[in-house]
Each structure stands twice: as C-alpha cells, then as structure tokens.
Amino acid sequence: MAGNDCGALLDEELSSFFLNYLSDTQGGESGEEQLCADLPELDLSQLDASDFDSATCFGELQWCPETSETEPSQYSPDDSEFFQIDSENEALLAALTKTLDDIPEDDVGLAAFPGLDEGDTPSCTPASPAPLSVPPSPALERLLSPVSEVDELSLLQKLLLATSSPTASSDALKDGATWSQTSLSSRSQRPCVKVDGTQDKKTPMLRSQSRPCTELHKHLTSVLPCPRGKACSPPPHPSPQLLSKEDEEVGEDCPSPWPAPASPQDSLGQDTANPNSAQVPKDDVRAMVQLIRYMHTYCLPQRKLPQRASEPIPQSCSSPLRKVPPRSRQTPKAFWTEFSILRELLAQDILCDVSKPYRLATPVYASLTPQSRTRPPKDSQASPAHSAMAEEVRITASPKSTGPRPSLRPLRLEVKRDVNKPARQKREEDEEEEEEEEEEEEKEDEEEEWGRKRPGRGLPWTKLGRKMDSSVCPVRRSRRLNPELGPWLTFTDEPLGALPSMCLATETHDLEEELGGLTDSSQGQQLPLGSQIPTLESPCESGCGDTDEDPSCPRPPSRDSPRCLMLALSQSDPLGKKSFEESLTVELCGTAGLTPPTTPPYKPMEEDPFKQDTKHSPGQDTAPSLPSPETLQLTATPGASHKLPKRHPERSELLSHLQHATTQPVSQAGQKRPFSCSFGDHDYCQVIRPEAALQRKVLRSWEPIKVHLEDLAHQGATLPVETKTPRREADQNCDPTPKDSMQLRDHEIRASLTKHFGLLETALEEEDLASCKSPEYDTVFEDSSSSSGESSFLLEEEEEEGGEEDDEGEDSGVSPPCSDHCPYQSPPSKASRQLCSRSRSSSGSSSCSSWSPATRKNFRLESRGPCSDGTPSARHAKKRREKAIGEGRVVYIRNLSGDMSSRELKKRFEVFGEIVECQVLRRSKRGQKHGFITFRCSEHAALSVRNGATLRKRNEPSFHLSYGGLRHFRWPRYTDYDPTSEESLPSSGKSKYEAMDFDSLLKEAQQSLH
C-alpha cells in the first residue's frame, strides 16, 4: 500500500520529536550543543524552537537542493527528478544511519521497532512470507531481504531507505533479483528494465560510510540499552516517494513486491559485534528514528509523486510465498495522521482516471491495495506472538476473500490512538473494551457482507432469486463532494484477537440497528486529535469481482430510512426475481454514473419517471423496468381499473370514453367534464352541466324526418322526468352501439348519439342563461344542430341573403325555406333570436357585396330585433362562431345543384372529416344554392377546400369552394374569394393584392418565398 507523503506528518509532532532529541541531556551537555558538536557540517545556530513549527524549518539547511552533485549514473534515466542529495548531507545521513548498527541484539535490537519486531522472523528462506495484515511495501521488503553476508548494510538503512546509499553490494542486488524471479505474479504491470549500474551505485554508499563517526555515534552508544521486552513506538512508515525511488533504483525489473523480511538475527548480528555498544533509552531511539525519518521525508521534492501499481493480484493461501511462522505477519506500519483517499489513488498505478471514481463500474476504493487477502483466523490473531499488532494501521479485506483471485470487497482501515505505548501495555488497557469493540466489528463485517451481496453486476446469487433492499442504493464516498461524510470516521482500539472470525455470523441482524450503531459509534469515537481516518466500509464499495458468495449466508433485512450513506431509488423492490440485465438497468440508473453537479451523491433520487403510479402491496414489489409475467399478474389483480380491455380496431377511442364515463353524479355541475358527446378536441376544458342541461346540443344526424319528429315529441313530453334522472340512465342507450362488432363510421356514431340524446330547443332556452356562462363551455361547445336556422354558426350570410330575398318576396328573414332538408322548425321567436344573435363580422363570401355599408349596417340593426341587448346567449353564440371562423373550419360552397339538401351535402363531405354543421341556403332569384360546412378540425376543412370539387356527380355543376367567414382577414373593401364570383366589385380603385382572391394571394406568397 502506498504510504502518505511528508505532508501527513504534523508540524507539532515533528517539533516534539526533534525537541525531544535536542533536550536529551544524558551525555552531560545540552542537546543543541551535542548536536552541533556531532554535526559540524550543519550550522544550527540560526535555528531556535520557534523554527520547528513551520514545514520549512529545514529549508535553510539545504537537505535537498535542486542541483545535485551526485553522479547521474546512480539512477535510472526515468528517475532523474527523484531524490537527490549532495555530499554534505550524505555525510550526515551516513552518520545517523550507521549508529544503530552497533546496538547489541540482546539489549535493544529490533525491540525499538515493534513493526520489525513482529514482522521479522528468524526464517531466512525467501519463499515463505506469511499472510500479512498489511501488504508490505516492495522497496521496504527488498531492503529487509536477507543480507547476512553483507555487513555494510545497516539496519536503519533497511528501515528508512537511505537513498544516498541505495545498495550496499552486488549481493543485495542478487538477492533482490532472486526475489524478482520467485514472485513474478505478485508484481503489477511495469516495464521490466534492469538497471546495470551496480558498481556505480555502490560507490556513493561506500564513500559515505567511509567517513568516520562523530560524537553522535559515541553519544548514542554510551547509554545503557533498554530491555528488549519493552517495545517502543513503531517506526514511521517510509514516505511513498522514497519507497518508489528505491523501487526504481534497485531494479525496475523486480516484479516481486513481497520478499521475506530480514530475520532479526541477521540484522542484529552486527549490533552484537560492537564491543563499545551500550544501552540506549527507548525514548532516545524513538526520537532518533523520528528525526531521521523526518529528514528523509524532507529530502524528496513535493511535486514528484510515485507511480505505484495497484491492480489486485491473485494470492492463494496455499501459495508457498504466504507461509511463514506467525511472527512475520506484522511489518512496519504507516501511522499518518490523516488518511486521504485521493492520496491513496494517486500513489498507485490505476488504469483509469482516479479523479472520477464514480464513473467506474467497481469503485477504486475497494482495491486500494493490490494485496487484499484473508484476515487470519480469530484464534491465530489472539496468539501472544501478535500482541503488538493492536497498534497497527490495518487495511484488511473482508472475511470472504479466501480465493486465489483478487478481492474487491470493501476495506476496513483501523488506526490505534496511542502509538507510543507498548503493544502489551495497550492490550491490557483495552481489555475492558474488547467485548464492545467485538460487537461493533461484527456489525461492520456483516454490513460489509450485506454491501457485497448487492446485485447488479452479474453475481451468481442474483440468479437464485435473492431480494435486496429496494430503498437503498450505494453511493460512492467522497469527503470532497459530500461534506456529510466527513465526520463518518471510525477508530478502534480493539486488540487483534477481538476481531470477528472469517465466516459471517449466521444470525440475522437488523440492518437499521447495524447502520445506526455504526454511524453513532463512529461519530462518538471522534478524537480531538488531528488523526481521523475514514472507515472504507460501505456497500457502494463492495466489489463485483467476488463471485463466490455463499447462498447460505443470511442477508440483513431491508432498511426503510437509510442515512446519507444510502440513496433512495425506489420504494419497490427493484430486483425481486429479475435477471442480470434488469438488475444492471437499476444500477445504471443510480448515482454512480452521474456527475456530482447533476445529482449529488447525498441527495435522494426521484422515483423512476417511467414507473406506473400504482401502489403495490409488500408481496407485489417489483422493478419499474421490464416486469416479469408474475409481476404483471400481481399488478393487474388489485388495480384492474387501470388495465382497460383491448379495443377492437374498428372501435374508436371516443366510444370507449363514452362507455366508461357515463356515471357522473348530478351534483358535479361546474366541474371538469371527462368527455364530450360532440367529440371535441378540448374535452379537458369542458364542464359538466347540471341535470337540467342533460339534453344538450349535439350533432344532428341525417336520419329520416319521421324519426326526429318522434324523438322530439317524446323528449318534449318527458323533459321534466329526464332532467331528474341520473345521467347513466340516459347514456345506457349508447352501450349497444359500441358492442356491435362491425366497423362504425363517424356519421353512424353521430346518428346514434343524436337519436338517444336528441335536441330539445325548449331546454336550450333555459340552459343558455344558466349554464353557458362558463368561459370553458362557451369556447368549446360548437356542436349545435346542423341544418336548421336556429342552430347555425354563420347566419350572417342568412341575414344578408334574407334581406336580398325579402326584396324578392321571400320570407327568409326569420328562417330560410328549408322544408326539403329541415326535419322540424323552431318557433319563430326562437329562430329570430338565434338569427339576430349572430355577429355580422363573420360573413362568408356569398354576402351581398353590392350593398353599401350604411344599408348593411341598418339591416343588421333591424334584424337583431329583441336580441340587441347583448344577452349571454348572444355573446355565447358570437364567441362560438368567431372561434370556428378564426380557426379556419368553415367552408363555403357555391354553385350547388337545385336538389342538393344539407343531409346529402353533409354525407358527401364527411369523407374529409367530422362535420359540426352543414347548412344549405337557396337564392330564389337565381335558383342557385350555396352551403356552409363547419368541420371539427381545420385540417379537414383545408382538405375539403382542395379536393371537394371532386365530389360532384356528372349531372351536377362544378362546386366552387373557399373559406367562409374570413372578413377579419380581408381589407375593408374586399371581393369574393371565389374567382368566378359575379358579384365582385370592380377593381379599378383597388390595388393589385386587393383584387386577388385568396388562392392567388397564397400562390404569389409562396412564389415570393422561393
């Protein structure tokens, strides 16, 4: 695992470490005097205690000048910018690192370094490193490899990677090469380039060690050694830059990052051979180690980040490389004060963009170390040989990673607070908290297991029909993007023996209790120290690389109210019994694939927009996408009303609406109407009329006159009764019509509706003032009767034609003579009221244009009669007419045959679309007929204008069609739109465009555009 950089060491701790060494007065003189005497090359007079508070306290001492005098042949060409040190500081490092070589084995030795004391074993066999609790650094273990035949390589050089002397002899390189060949599978992808500057690299170290030791050596070896049984604080983990530097210097061909640690006997043999060695207090040794490590840390430029490979590698427990006596499980530990995931990612050679971990199928956090391996069993962890492991910073894989392949399961990072205490003493102090910590650890492990078993990536368990909690979706953890996750940190002081066993506990725990305990305990354990390390333990970081899930292991129950660590996706089970593809759909819909500015990971996501808005029972929770057959069956059972029967192709949607919307209560007057009997395009804005308005205006059919007269008489006689009956009784007559299997045409539908609903003129007189005041109703119901004068939209033409016919002795001012096509006549008062209620601004092109404006105005005023007071009925009729004209739904037809009736005309033009009104008027003077047809849609009207002339018979004159009632689109003086009109005014005083008809204007406008 890549360690932290030098910035992880806090200035306060550095200051205390260094001042601890300076204040040591066991030699009889002050620490500053001793240090100045021991290190004549450095001028420390310019430093005082205040200088140690800043990170640049050694900046003036020139530990790492940019321009180095060292020979470039020592380094490989790729490492030219790495650690460089001049000869002056090289002497200091050589003096400091050689001092511990003379420490006797039985007095201090590796006891000063608990990391080595428990990580090193007497075994010198290179093929037996045990499963380590922390994956050791490749460069560190390469330095810790057996070097019993090399006396020059000191113990501290192995610990601190003195880069001024990278290799002591060719034997060390040979050992490293041997390790490279034995563990090729352990090395991630790096170019195998062997550096052949062995003798050149050896020379600087020999030169630095040839310098005589100063008084510092005598001072450090003149004190009584501390007993070995008392372990000091673990030595600091070497900086990642130094590790990477040594890794590249010693040999880039070495693919083995895990050689066996050096045995204590080999390392301490040199110490026992020194007769002048004396006991050294553990505080001095600790301070010395910290000081040297501090100096080495500052020797590396900050801008250079190492490139470390981090791909998980297969590690089998049966491999000979993993079998070592238990004491070699522990290696030097990293104890940085603040853990940074970004630092971890940058320190590794990840084949992806680590700045966007949320774009990965598997989170990079799950593979922070390429050496994820099995935690040792509980009984072996509790052995006395591993007592000091309680001080370590562990990054361990979850309990199930026992296979030979890499484990991408979430990692748990644990750090111990009191790193300066001996391991045994700490274990004695923590015995009271073992049980509590063990329970928390078991909860964490089960949460890990629960997170690993989430579906969505093709795991075998998804094919077994397992269900997961549908209300939680894993969210990636990032303190930079999610401030709420900052305090979610866990510290455990639990000894290693108290950890849970490898297998997941068989009893099922409540997930809410687990997550609550985890978050509450982790927040309660926050320390005032600056060292807070996030626990990398989450379902979102569970891997998809482990496919050996045990189906017998229980899964925690679902949790209804997840915290910020979970993301609510859906309230139904998204993966009840779905296949891999459907599960992947849910995963892709999660936040892992979204950028943070779009959907922050801590913000709950909305429901699936494509999910049906139906509430399922607990047994009917299904995924919103791709429902299974049993899902459809379950859903259709309670909500049958949402599933309409399949319509026959010949039945229109309008009939279905009529069939299902016939149960409106009487008291719902003024509410929105679910449908319109007139099949309007604006059904949503129609209102429900009271029962008094039940027999509302609908389209009249072209059925025989006798039928209409009978219906009229029957409806007129039973009006008081029908107004009190529910609407469903009146609409039940519509049911036989849609049940008919033969294809129904629009005119047949309208005929059937007209037959059963009819039109009561007497009821309309009462309705207009009571129910037609609503603007929604006024602008929508354009479904008045077809052929009679009282139901006409555009009776202005009738008025003008009536005026013309009055001059000729024909009484058409009240109603045009339409006995051949009008089944029944309305009372004269009603017809007169409806006639004069129409606005003259909507006149068709057949109006008498020869009249002067004054004459026309006078006739309008006279013809309005009793309706000139502007009643709501008149306003309503005017509004409906203007709306139809403005939408271009009115077609004016000239030159009709003498025997043409409105019913026949309507039947012919129904081929273009639904007709709201059809009216035929007669001109007695010329014996010609003209008609108006109002379509439901303007598109149908336009189609009829273009192709209506083809509907005539052979013995009939040709039709002349144009849009009617478009006076507001024309000039004050206008001519008939019909180019063959005989009544057009002379165009002498008009411009070119005023004299042109509409079609000509349209063609010219189109030509001008091209």
UniProtKB/Swiss-Prot annotation:
Motif (LXXLL motif 2): 156-160
Biased composition regions of type Low complexity, renumbered to the chain: 521-532, 782-794, 832-852
Biased composition (Basic and acidic residues): 411-428, 604-618
Region (Abolishes DNA transcriptional activity when missing): 1-91
RRM domain sequence ranges: 889-963
SMART domains on file: RRM
Motif LXXLL motif 1, residue numbers: 140-144
Organism: Rattus norvegicus (Rat)
Composition bias type Polar residues, residue spans: 178-189, 264-279, 369-384, 619-638, 659-670
Motif (LXXLL motif 3): 342-346
Phosphoserine modification, residue list: 145, 148, 383, 628
Claim: NAD is one of the keywords in the record: no
Protein name: Peroxisome proliferator-activated receptor gamma coactivator 1-beta
Extent of Acidic residues compositional bias: 429-449, 795-811
InterPro entries associated with the record: Nucleotide-bd_a/b_plait_sf (IPR012677), PGC-1 (IPR034605), PPARGC1B_RRM (IPR034177), RBD_domain_sf (IPR035979), RRM_dom (IPR000504)
The keyword Magnesium appears for this protein: no
GO cellular component: mediator complex; mitochondrion; nucleus
Phylogenetic placement of the source organism: Eukaryota, Metazoa, Chordata, Craniata, Vertebrata
Expression tissues: Ubiquitous with higher expression in heart, brown adipose tissue.
Positions of disulphide bridges: none
Domain comment (free text): Contains 3 Leu-Xaa-Xaa-Leu-Leu (LXXLL) motif, which are usually required for the association with nuclear receptors.
Role description: Plays a role of stimulator of transcription factors and nuclear receptors activities. Activates transcriptional activity of estrogen receptor alpha, nuclear respiratory factor 1 (NRF1) and glucocorticoid receptor in the presence of glucocorticoids. May play a role in constitutive non-adrenergic-mediated mitochondrial biogenesis as suggested by increased basal oxygen consumption and mitochondrial number when overexpressed. May be part of the pathways regulating the elevation of gluconeogenesis, beta-oxidation of fatty acids and ketogenesis during fasting.
